[in-house]
Amino acid sequence: MLIEKYHVWAKFDVEEPGVIIAFVSMYGNTANAASLLATKLGLAGVKNIRLYDLNSVDFSYIIGDVYRFSNLVLLAPNYNVTLHLTAQHFLTELEYHGFTKRNYSLVANSTWGGRALPFMEETFSKFRDVKLVGEPFTILTKLKEDTTNNLDNLAKEIVKSLE
């Protein structure tokens, strides 16, 4: 049993289907979107869902689950015209740990301009053997009808990727 686990870990294979939702929120709007996504996934029957606030949970706990489960969703806001620094730090940790063989989804939050989504897309394009699930999108400040529909579609795509 232990040897089998070691082989899975050494090859960075997925241990079990599941979704990590990691988010940074400055005023609560991105946190609300992350929570709503987790709810939608749970209602769709997804059993393994972990919701992590990157501002309050040590990355070591999150990275462990990133390698345990099949899907990672990152939601983060713009800050000073780029990706929030905590999200940037998390992406750096993923790079250091050789993020691979996983599905990922991206959601940015912005009030005006900014490079949060392009920054995330550029970073994930460097990872090998990863697959984008759903269409990346930007929430303009808070969820509205159009971005709630985008969140619905993302949840459906994530559920499909787990089958």
What are these regions (language model features)?
Residues 58:
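Active-site loop segments of alpha/beta catalytic cores
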